[in-house]
Regions:
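Terminal signal-anchor or tail-anchor transmembrane helices
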Residues: 3-25
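Terminal accessory/targeting
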Residues: 11-14, 29-33, 237-239, 243
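Helical scaffold of the NTase/Pol beta-like nucleotidyltransferase catalytic core
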Residues: 29-90
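Conserved catalytic core of two-metal-ion nucleotidyltransferases
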Residues: 60-81, 128-229, 237-257
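Active-site nucleotide-donor binding segment shared across nucleotidyl transfer reactions
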Residues: 77-110, 117-120
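Structural signal for hydrophobic/aromatic residues that build the beta-strand cores
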Residues: 109-112, 213
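Conserved donor-nucleotide/metal-binding helix-loop-beta segment in metal-dependent transferases, i.e.
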Residues: 119-121, 125-131
Length: 257
């Protein structure tokens, strides 16, 4: 049976977590609640949230943070283009560029994919050195190596001098007539994400589209890919209930190196 002291301790921890949550959230988000059809500005350019149903509470990111997200994307795009490494937007970032024609104004990280053939380089010291030269850095979760992944295998990138925003890059592999996102790996093989498994022609060829003043690499059939991952209503309903990625990263910063 739980005693009074345990209840007090749990209550204190919950209050402390709530205070930390609000403090961290204020670094990156405004108190402006996202509403369908609302307008906002980034460097005097006007944007408009799609006028469709919204589920959950989303809050507008700070303008300076949205500028940093854009800068991180452009810096990484130019880096990988120079290295002749193909990457493309995925997940919530792809959803943003297709549905909003820009980054979603409440999504605080960038999601990317690349082929498994690039994994060795991205786990190398050379990769870290090359990023350093252009003002970027790579972070890898504790326990994650080129040979073994136990939780959401991938790398994380950010601009030097900033804890956030971050870019997560996950690996995919061609398997027969399909391309599969790799969830984890070990010496026995790869584990795949069933929701992110596509016929070759849905993903390939990757297309460079000019969206919101940027060249954005997207899948061949992005609408079909979004339907497979998010369901038939991805362009009819906006879901905003997930906790900020920035908060989790700030609190768990010690597990990345």
């Amino acid at each position: 049976m739980i005693n009074t002291y345990t209840i007090i301790l749990i209550s204190f921890l919950l209050i402390l977590m709530a205070i930390i949550y609000r403090h961290e959230e204020a670094k990156y988000k405004t108190k402006i609640k996202i509403k369908p059809g609302m307008e906002y500005k980034i460097r005097e350019k006007k944007y408009k949230v799609p006028n469709i149903k919204m589920v959950g509470d989303g809050f507008l990111l700070r303008e300076d943070f949205m500028i940093k997200i854009r800068r991180l994307y452009l810096m990484s795009y130019l880096f990988f283009k120079k290295k002749n490494i193909l990457t493309w937007v995925s997940g919530g970032t792809l959803l943003g560029f297709i549905r909003h024609k820009t980054f979603m104004p409440w999504d605080d990280d960038i999601d990317m994919h690349t082929f498994i053939e690039n994994k060795s380089y991205m786990f190398s010291e050379q990769f870290k050195d090359d990023l350093d030269k252009v003002g970027l850095e790579c972070l890898i979760m504790e326990g994650l190596t080129e040979e073994k992944s136990h939780y959401k295998g991938g790398i994380r990138m950010r601009m030097k001098g900033y804890k956030n925003p971050v870019m997560d890059i996950f690996f995919v592999e061609k398997v027969g007539n399909e391309v599969k996102k790799i969830e984890n790996w070990n010496t026995e093989g790869n584990e795949y994400n069933l929701k992110e498994t596509w016929k070759n022609n849905i993903l390939l060829p990757i297309k460079g589209e000019f969206i919101d003043g940027m060249t954005v690499n997207i899948p061949n059939k992005p609408e079909e890919m979004l339907t497979l991952q998010y369901g038939e209503d991805w362009n009819k309903v906006m879901y905003c209930s997930h906790p900020p990625h920035t908060l989790a990263f700030d609190l768990l910063d010690f597990i990345w190196h």
